[in-house]
Amino acid sequence: MESFLFTSESVNEGHPDKLCDQISDAILDACLEQDPESKVACETCTKTNMVMVFGEITTKANVDYEQIVRKTCREIGFVSADVGLDADNCKVLVNIEQQSPDIAQGVHGHLTKKPEEVGAGDQGHMFGYATDETPELMPLTHVLATKLGAKLTEVRKNGTCPWLRPDGKTQVTIEYINESGAMVPVRVHTVLISTQHDETVTNDEIAADLKEHVIKPVIPEKYLDEKTIFHLNPSGRFVIGGPHGDAGLTGRKIIIDTYGGWGAHGGGAFSGKDPTKVDRSGAYIVRQAAKSIVASGLARRVIVQVSYAIGVPEPLSVFVDSYGTGKIPDKEILEIVKESFDFRPGMISINLDLKRGGNGRFLKTAAYGHFGRDDADFTWEVVKPLKSNKVQA
């Protein structure tokens, strides 16, 4: 059987784009914690010695935006200009306005509409994906790239590798076999890690530490062999990083946030958006639908699409493709999905409890992926029993 190579990348929490995602979601958390009806569309950008938050927020919450920005930067590890940003001394700019009254009346009637009547906050189409190649029902390339990034941060923060700095990127290439539409990983072909570091460490020390403390604990031994290629800081030097090295912006890592290039993406980012924004809530409900299909045994691999019009509660379309792995025709899987899931934005918010902030709930989603996470706050990862007599017991 012929094999092929597929690659997914990730970035860790100190990447400037991910820093912005986390600030936007920390602000969303703070608003929802005090006022679950908050309407939030919060963007963040950053460059050397500066963070700016801007957008539209209508809330009864009393939120100190500057304090949230500095706290988020500090907790990631941006505590001095040497590492890319000084949380306590950088400039923080805030330009937040209220939600447009035109949008407010069309979507939620200035909070007068019942949940089932709440319209989509904008037009758009979202995709959910699931595959049986990992316990998380996520693509292995994405899972490993994401876990490598998380491990980089762990060994930096716990002091195992004190030379590490916050910024970093990972990439994993895997050799696959297509088994009648299902994806079967054979081996890891290439591992790439580029991580920010201090001036004192040598490239040999970097490579040795990354293999021992990052790659070894994350990638199962069965996927590594003598032919596996390792590119460890291949540029040779990565001292300047974070916002000092590159500008950052909310919503620029949407493939990392989802499925690592597998499935499809409608283009809408997640972070800084309350659940009336179907870019987020729509993507969450179709992930739950896709995961539930695979977990129930109806298919080994599946993609689900939903689409919306602004101000309209009911979706315009729902689509299912099982890539030929379905135990029953896709048309029948689609009917089961439509019967089992309520795609109206107001009902998604209720059924997935998306108006609940606090506990760093959405902040947690903003680094290391929104899907495939084992965390009670990730309610869309709960497999839902499907309404059909064709589902495996």
Swiss-Prot record:
GO terms for cellular component: cytosol; nucleolus; plant-type cell wall; plasma membrane; plasmodesma. The lineage of its organism: Eukaryota, Viridiplantae, Streptophyta, Embryophyta, Tracheophyta. PANTHER family: S-ADENOSYLMETHIONINE SYNTHETASE. Mg(2+) binds at residue 9. CDD domains: S-AdoMet_synt. Pathway: Amino-acid biosynthesis; S-adenosyl-L-methionine biosynthesis; S-adenosyl-L-methionine from L-methionine: step 1/1. Homotetramer. L-methionine binds at residues 56, 99, 246, 277. Disulfide bonds: none annotated. Its cofactor is Mn(2+); Mg(2+); Co(2+); K(+). This is S-adenosylmethionine synthase 4. One of its GO terms (molecular function) is mRNA binding. K(+) binds at residue 43. Catalyzes the formation of S-adenosylmethionine from methionine and ATP. The reaction comprises two steps that are both catalyzed by the same enzyme: formation of S-adenosylmethionine (AdoMet) and triphosphate, and subsequent hydrolysis of the triphosphate. It comes from the Eukaryota. One of its GO terms (biological process) is methionine metabolic process.
